[in-house]
């Protein structure tokens, strides 16, 4: 009988439990549980509801029991940078504030009193983003110093869920690298940097690599769900898992992990922490097997998701794509990476305001708004592809788009046209596939990453756009 492996993939807007197993030499997936996610306002801050989310994680485990498909292992992946601080009794200190909150405004200047941006990049290789853990911790230090005094443990979001499942405190490497406090040379916390910033060393747990067994379910959770399994750390940063699932074994490609964010880059064995790389705002995030994801964060489908939400989700993404195609000659463009689009009160109005401010024609219909966003994204991809080629001194023949955005046919066509490269779209469930793949590699269902990626290609295929 085939062994089942469970990926709990929690994104910014929803979470899913997806079970995978091998059947006739192919990987087969089944989504068994889904739940909503999103930040809520609490005490004037944008916060995650981690207590509710963890109940949903447990509910999905109960669903496994209910349908009689009990996994041998499971792993949780989420977005990057966010964390909890625990006191000596393992209680959460303060609100579980999310990365879109404005508490980090001005915190970069506080960090640069201890270390310059240039030196920080040389040490960590991580691109500057105001929501990185390093700046969030500075916000805690400035606004709630008592939390840092009381904190015994820092856990990133997936590590926190693994702790609630097992009672074991770990910090997984790929997630930790997103926070800008890890050395790409030692692949460990940069304790000297941590000391310079005045963050307590004792909070930072030992880093573990993806594929490491964390432990079995605690007695309490085991009794609640009715079975036991091993919790295995995947690449807990969702992009790290998605990149593991890119169905290619050569190195002649750029990938885009396309979802709420678009993460566009290449895999490499060494980090590039040069001044030029810093100026170009590339980042060196940790990947599976000690590889680096050399990439750029691009706003991604967040903009179109927000616009859809503002019309009360009255249209599917496919319908919005069709409207965009009808308005394809609309001439205006926006900078998809402008921070004004990170957390606006109203995305539709923000796009209009941007066009107005820059002296362009202002979009009025939903189709016009959508075509501005999609075309701007495709042009941003083309610009980033050129920058990657400039930084690496080589050209790439194709772009692999994985994740939910790989299903956006119109955007894929625009990207092929803008980049003049072949687009290989799929698999859409790349993050869950990568999560399950890390578990299967540990269980020796696959001997190597290369074998796993070959099977992923055979199992899910790709759609080619030229």
Segments the model singles out, each with a brief description of its role:
Residues 77-81, 210-211, 258-261, 398-406:
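Glycine-rich beta-strand-to-loop/alpha-helix junction loops that act as flexible
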Residues 6-7, 19, 112-125, 135-156, ...:
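Active-site core segments that coordinate phosphate-bearing ligands/cofactors
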Residues 1-94, 122, 150, 222-231, ...:
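N-terminal glycine/serine-rich phosphate-binding loop of ATP-dependent small-molecule kinases
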Residues 70-78, 153, 206, 394-403:
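Short glycine-rich phosphate-binding loop at a beta-alpha junction
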Residues 66-98, 127-131, 162-183, 206-209:
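Short beta-strand-loop/turn "lid" adjacent to the catalytic site in phosphate-handling enzymes
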Residues 101:
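Carbohydrate-associated surface elements
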Residues 59-72, 130, 137-138, 145, ...:
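Conserved phosphate-binding loops in N-terminal lobes of ATP-dependent enzymes
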Residues 46-54, 126, 130, 207-211, ...:
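Short acidic-aromatic active-site loops that bind/stabilize oxyanions
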């Amino acid at each position: 009988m085939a062994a089942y492996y469970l990926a709990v993939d929690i994104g910014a807007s929803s979470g899913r439990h997806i079970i995978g197993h091998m059947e006739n030499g192919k990987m087969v997936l089944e989504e068994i549980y889904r739940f909503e996610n999103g930040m809520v306002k609490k005490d004037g801050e944008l916060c995650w509801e981690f207590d509710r989310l963890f109940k949903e994680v447990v509910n999905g485990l109960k669903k496994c029991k209910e349908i009689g498909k009990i996994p041998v292992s499971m792993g949780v992946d989420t977005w990057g940078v966010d964390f909890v601080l625990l006191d000596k009794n393992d209680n959460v200190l303060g609100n579980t504030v999310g990365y879109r909150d404005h508490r980090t405004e001005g915190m970069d200047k506080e960090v640069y009193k201890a270390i310059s941006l240039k030196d920080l990049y040389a040490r960590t290789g991580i691109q500057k983003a105001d929501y990185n853990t390093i700046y969030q911790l500075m916000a805690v230090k400035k606004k709630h110093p008592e939390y840092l005094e009381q904190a015994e443990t820092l856990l990133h979001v997936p590590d926190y869920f693994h702790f609630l499942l097992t009672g074991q405190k770990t910090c997984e490497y790929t997630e930790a690298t997103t926070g800008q406090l890890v050395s790409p040379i030692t692949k460990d916390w940069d304790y000297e940097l941590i000391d310079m910033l005045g963050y307590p060393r004792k909070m930072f747990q030992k880093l573990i690599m993806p594929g490491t067994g964390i432990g079995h379910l605690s007695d309490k959770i085991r009794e609640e769900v009715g079975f036991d399994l091993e919790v295995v750390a995947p690449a807990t940063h969702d992009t790290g898992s998605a990149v593991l699932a890119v169905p290619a074994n050569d190195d002649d490609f750029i990938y885009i992990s396309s979802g709420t964010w678009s993460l566009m880059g290449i895999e490499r064995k060494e980090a590039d922490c040069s001044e030029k790389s810093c100026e170009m705002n590339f980042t060196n995030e940790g990947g599976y097997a000690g590889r680096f994801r050399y990439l750029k964060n691009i706003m991604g489908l967040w903009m179109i998701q927000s616009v859809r939400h503002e019309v009360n989700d009255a249209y599917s993404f496919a319908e919005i794509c069709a409207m965009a195609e009808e308005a394809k000659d609309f001439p205006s463009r926006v900078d998809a990476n402008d921070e004004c689009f990170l957390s606006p009160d109203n995305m539709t109005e923000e796009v209009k305001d941007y066009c107005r401010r820059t002296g362009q024609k202002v979009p009025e219909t939903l189709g016009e708004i959508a075509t501005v966003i999609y075309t701007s994204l495709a042009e941003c991809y083309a610009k980033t592809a050129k920058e990657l080629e400039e930084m690496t001194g080589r050209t790439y023949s194709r772009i692999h788009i994985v994740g939910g955005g790989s299903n956006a046919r119109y955007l894929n066509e625009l990207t092929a046209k803008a980049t003049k490269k072949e687009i290989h779209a799929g698999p859409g469930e790349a993050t869950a596939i990568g999560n399950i793949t890390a578990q299967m590699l540990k269980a020796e269902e696959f001997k190597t990453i290369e074998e796993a990626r070959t099977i992923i290609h055979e199992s899910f295929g790709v759609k080619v756009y030229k």
